[in-house]
Every structure is written in structure tokens, then in C-alpha cells.
């Protein structure tokens, strides 16, 4: 009888031991699963701003809505155009400007017909082309810059096209330093301001002027005069003295990097020698540089909206942003 009771107690204890062992294992498994789930969820939340899993891939439709609280937006299209084309408001205007007080809402609504969701179109104005070097930040997933083309600003357009279509690393130049030199073909000096008059004197290895006198600024060679923006190229690996009106112009030493593939340039031309190969109506255009021959700004925007797919397909959304202070470190 005693043995039977002892056996019964042992069996019960074994059953309890096995149950507790299994229960503890299940408890630990459940606890571990919860901890791992919480860690993964937090990591995804922390890295959401820099991960590219939610990046758009434009194929005729933008897939996600812009987050207006995020200044570095990876799901939007920014369009930059001169603020001078926003004319006096009122019906019946024939000057060709954007005279509709609701022009921004109208343009955004028309982009919606092409698949862009509400809130994904950002219209921004600029005062002068040199603003893109000095103050304009381009941080959208796609950026389109519209620049009027005329014989009087053709040089500035070429320079700003070079600037916005490529990535640059820049540092401010201190002209109190005696000489500067450029180290390669991708090394240029960016001059920008209200009036940039820049002249240089190249020096030989003995620091004597080559075709000029370092002590006489009147003998310096003029590289830029009465311009708002200039990308200055001098002979590489040759020291130069620089003369510039620092009150109305700034100078940066810049190194050209890779192409900025999320940015395109549209030049507005009224020239009779218009090059049709640059029109967005030409499907062969792949250089991210277009021309539209028109005088009326509603015609210009209608053309951009209608051919936005052609323009977007020359671009890549995931790319560096542009900041005026120099090297573009952050990716869209």
C-alpha cells in the first residue's frame, strides 16, 4: 500500500515537473517573440526617414502621398519657375502670365489627372538663377527647373544648367589668401551675386604674373563682368591672384561630382532657331534638358503636365538633394 502511494506521488510529481518544464519553455518562447517583435518595430520606425523601401518608382502614377511634415520629401515633385511670371490677378489678361489667383491649385489638379496624388505637387518660385547656388534647396524626389531663355541670359542658363544637373562640393573662398588654383577639370569656381566682376592673374613658379602684373589689377584678365552667376574655369595647377567686388559677389571653390539624376531643366524659348530635338514632344530626349517654345505660361505648364511622363522617365528619384552650403550628403 505504501509503495502504491509512493508510486502515485512520484507519477504526480513527474507530471507536474513535465508540465512546468513545458510551460516555462512556452513562456520563454512567447516572451522572446514579443521582445523581438518590439525591437524590429522600433528599428523600422527609427529608420523610416532614411530607408528607400517606400521610395516611388514613377511609371505613370505616383504611389504615395507627400508627407508635408517632412522637409526632406522622397515622394513629391517640385517645380521651380520665376516669380516674375505670376502676373496681376484678374480675368481676361493677355500678357501670358499666371493671372489666375488659384493657379497653384489648378496646376496641381491637372497633375492629378496624370496620376499624381493630391499634395504631391510643390510649386516654388525663384527671383534669379543665382538663387540656386545661394539659397534654393531642392529636396523633392523629383525636381524640375523652368528657366526663360533669351540671348541676354544664355551664359547664365548654361552655367545654372551645369550646376543643377550635377552634384557639387563647395567651400567658401577667402580672397585674403594670396593665391588659389584649380586642381582638375572638375574643379571650378562659382561666382554668384547681384553683380559679379571677376578677374585673375595667373602666376608662374616664381610668382611672377603670366601676361599680367600681380600688383596692378588693371592688367588682370576679366573672366566675368556684370553677371549674377558664373562658373569660372582657369588653367589647372596654375596659381592665380583673384580680383573681385566682394560687396556684391561671392566666390566658392567647387568640385563637380556625379550627375544629379532626379533633376531636369526646361528652357523656355521664343527663338526662331528653336531646336526641336530638345522638346519634350520628342521621345528621344534623354539628357534631362528640354526646351519649350512658347510665350504663354499656361501653354508652358499645360505642355509640361501633358508630357510629364516623358520628362520623368529621363530621371531617377533616389538621388542626392541640393543644399546651398555645399556637398549634398543626404539622399532622397
Curated annotation (Swiss-Prot):
UniProt subcellular location: Virion; Host endoplasmic reticulum lumen
Annotated InterPro entries: VP7, VP7_1, VP7_2
Annotated glycan sites: 67, 225
Description of post-translational modifications: N-glycosylated. Intramolecular disulfide bonds.
Signal peptide region: 1-33
GO CC annotation terms, alphabetical: host cell endoplasmic reticulum lumen; T=13 icosahedral viral capsid; viral outer capsid
Listed Pfam families: VP7
Job of this protein: Calcium-binding protein that interacts with rotavirus cell receptors once the initial attachment by VP4 has been achieved. Rotavirus attachment and entry into the host cell probably involves multiple sequential contacts between the outer capsid proteins VP4 and VP7, and the cell receptors. Following entry into the host cell, low intracellular or intravesicular Ca(2+) concentration probably causes the calcium-stabilized VP7 trimers to dissociate from the virion. This step is probably necessary for the membrane-disrupting entry step and the release of VP4, which is locked onto the virion by VP7.
Family (UniProt): Belongs to the rotavirus VP7 family.
Official protein name in the record: Outer capsid glycoprotein VP7
Amino acid at each position: 500500500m505504501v509503495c502504491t502511494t509512493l508510486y502515485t506521488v512520484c507519477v504526480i510529481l513527474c507530471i507536474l515537473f513535465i508540465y512546468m518544464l513545458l510551460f516555462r519553455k512556452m513562456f520563454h518562447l512567447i516572451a522572446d517573440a514579443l521582445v523581438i517583435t518590439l525591437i524590429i518595430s522600433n528599428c523600422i520606425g527609427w529608420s523610416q526617414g532614411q530607408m528607400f523601401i517606400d521610395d516611388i518608382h514613377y511609371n505613370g502614377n505616383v504611389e504615395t502621398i507627400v508627407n508635408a511634415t517632412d522637409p526632406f520629401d522622397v515622394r513629391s515633385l517640385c517645380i521651380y519657375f520665376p516669380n516674375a511670371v505670376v502676373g496681376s490677378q484678374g480675368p481676361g489678361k493677355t500678357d501670358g502670365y499666371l493671372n489666375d489667383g488659384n493657379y497653384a491649385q489648378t496646376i496641381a489638379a491637372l497633375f492629378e489627372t496624370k496620376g499624381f496624388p493630391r499634395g504631391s505637387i510643390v510649386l516654388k518660385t525663384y527671383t534669379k538663377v543665382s538663387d540656386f547656388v545661394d539659397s534654393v534647396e531642392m529636396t523633392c524626389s523629383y525636381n524640375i527647373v523652368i528657366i526663360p531663355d533669351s540671348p541676354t541670359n544664355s551664359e547664365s542658363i548654361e552655367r545654372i544648367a551645369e550646376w543643377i544637373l550635377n552634384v557639387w562640393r563647395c567651400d567658401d573662398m577667402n580672397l585674403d589668401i594670396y593665391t588659389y588654383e584649380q586642381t582638375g577639370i572638375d574643379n571650378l569656381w562659382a561666382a554668384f551675386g547681384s553683380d559679379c566682376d571677376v578677374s585673375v592673374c595667373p602666376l608662374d613658379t616664381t610668382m611672377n604674373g603670366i601676361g599680367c602684373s600681380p600688383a596692378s589689377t588693371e592688367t588682370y584678365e576679366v573672366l566675368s563682368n556684370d553677371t549674377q552667376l558664373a562658373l569660372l574655369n582657369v588653367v589647372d595647377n596654375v596659381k592665380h591672384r583673384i580680383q573681385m567686388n566682394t560687396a556684391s559677389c561671392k566666390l566658392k571653390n567647387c568640385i563637380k561630382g556625379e550627375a544629379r539624376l532626379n533633376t531636369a531643366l526646361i528652357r523656355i524659348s521664343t527663338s526662331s532657331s528653336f531646336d526641336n530635338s530638345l522638346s519634350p514632344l520628342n521621345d528621344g530626349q534623354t539628357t534631362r534638358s528640354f526646351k519649350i517654345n512658347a510665350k504663354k505660361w499656361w501653354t508652358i505648364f499645360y505642355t509640361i503636365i501633358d508630357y510629364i511622363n516623358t520628362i520623368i522617365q529621363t530621371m531617377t528619384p533616389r538621388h542626392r538633394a541640393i543644399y546651398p552650403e555645399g556637398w549634398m550628403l543626404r539622399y532622397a
